[in-house]
């Protein structure tokens, strides 16, 4: 198995990317190989700094980089030898089993939609992220940014995608799916959330427990939290800020430490034909390492095949 990394993606690339890749290669030894994609002239000297064993990592050379500020679609189309474009081609051809990048988020979404494409039957892929539960374990929230406006049918599908990830990757036998809303009652919320509630309620593929509120986010009420990308992104950034506040105030707490984005490393794009993960632009070596390990976990669990089978029916 091969897990690929865009070595040129992120604010601290390629240094942080290479360091994270070396850490991941050590932790995945005997399970999967880490493949670096990017400027070989920059990557090789950095690998050498990490010792002889690091120099054995495979490097796929590229000559272009999609910068953070570039227009995603235009850059992806014009820079076909960029680390992101090449990464997606390797993923689509089956040469690697997962592709991770802390680079341009928009370009990662463009590549997901136009190179590997959505699973037949999926209206719109979603970006997911993770919610540490107070009593231990992890929940999943989606969408967190790919789709600011959603149709009820899209929210229903997010419930299915999240439930499959929770079951097959997180190991939750019967994931509880909750719809983020402004009240628990069935008739609460916008026209979209009310309609989505009715669809989720009768969906045979999920265990829907009804509406949940913001205060339920971190408890065990729901394992899968469904929302549109606008709401999900606000929730995600707010949760990340809680960790930042704790750190600035010098407060150490095991639970709040789990809100640190580094612990999971990245956000999977669910509903596409291959495994792709988007990392934080400020990703550290630890975050890069955990993103690659998450890529391995997704590939090992066969989550894409599970999604394809579900949406085939």
Locations of the language-model features?
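Short, glycine-rich nucleotide/cofactor-binding loops
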Residues: 4-15, 76, 146-156, 278-285
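Short glycine/serine/threonine-rich phosphate/pyrophosphate-binding segments
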Residues: 13-17, 81-94, 98-112, 119, ...
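N-terminal glycine-rich anion-binding loop in soluble enzyme alpha/beta folds
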Residues: 13-70
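Glycine-rich phosphate/diphosphate-binding loop of Rossmann-like nucleotide-binding domains
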Residues: 15-16, 28-35, 41-44, 148-210, ...
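Phosphate/nucleotide-donor binding subsite
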Residues: 52-96
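Glycine-rich phosphate-binding loop
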Residues: 90-109, 184, 188, 193-256
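Glycine-rich phosphate/nucleotide-binding loop
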Residues: 113-127, 133-141, 218-313
């Amino acid at each position: 198995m091969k897990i690929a990394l865009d070595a040129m993606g992120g604010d601290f690339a390629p240094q942080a990317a290479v360091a994270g890749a070396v850490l991941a290669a050590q932790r995945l030894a005997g399970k999967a190989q880490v493949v670096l994609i990017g400027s070989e002239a920059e990557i090789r000297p950095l690998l050498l700094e990490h010792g002889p064993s690091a120099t054995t990592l495979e490097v796929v050379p590229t000559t272009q980089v999609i910068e953070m500020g570039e227009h995603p679609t235009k850059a992806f189309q014009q820079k076909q030898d960029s680390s992101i474009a090449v990464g997606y081609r390797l993923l689509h051809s089956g040469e690697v089993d997962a592709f991770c990048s802390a680079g341009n988020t928009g370009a990662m979404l463009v590549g997901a939609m136009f190179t590997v494409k959505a699973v037949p039957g999926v209206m719109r892929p979603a970006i997911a992220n993770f919610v540490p539960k107070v009593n231990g374990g992890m929940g999943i929230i989606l969408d967190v940014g790919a789709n600011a406006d959603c149709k009820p049918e899209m929210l229903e599908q997010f419930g299915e995608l999240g439930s499959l990830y929770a079951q097959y990757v997180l190991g939750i036998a019967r994931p509880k799916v909750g719809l983020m809303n402004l009240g628990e009652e069935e008739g609460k919320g916008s026209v979209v959330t009310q309609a989505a509630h009715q669809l989720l309620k009768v969906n045979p593929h999920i265990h829907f427990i009804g509406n949940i509120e913001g205060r339920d986010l971190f408890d065990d009420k729901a394992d899968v939290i469904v929302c549109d990308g606008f709401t999900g992104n606000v929730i995600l950034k707010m949760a990340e800020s809680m960790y930042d506040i704790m750190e600035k105030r010098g407060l150490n707490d095991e639970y709040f430490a789990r809100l640190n984005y580094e612990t999971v490393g990245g956000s999977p794009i669910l509903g596409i034909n291959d495994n792709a993960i988007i990392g934080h632009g400020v990703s550290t070596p630890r975050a890069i390492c955990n993103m690659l390990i998450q890529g391995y976990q997704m590939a090992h669990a066969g989550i894409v095949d599970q999604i394809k089978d579900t949406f085939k029916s």
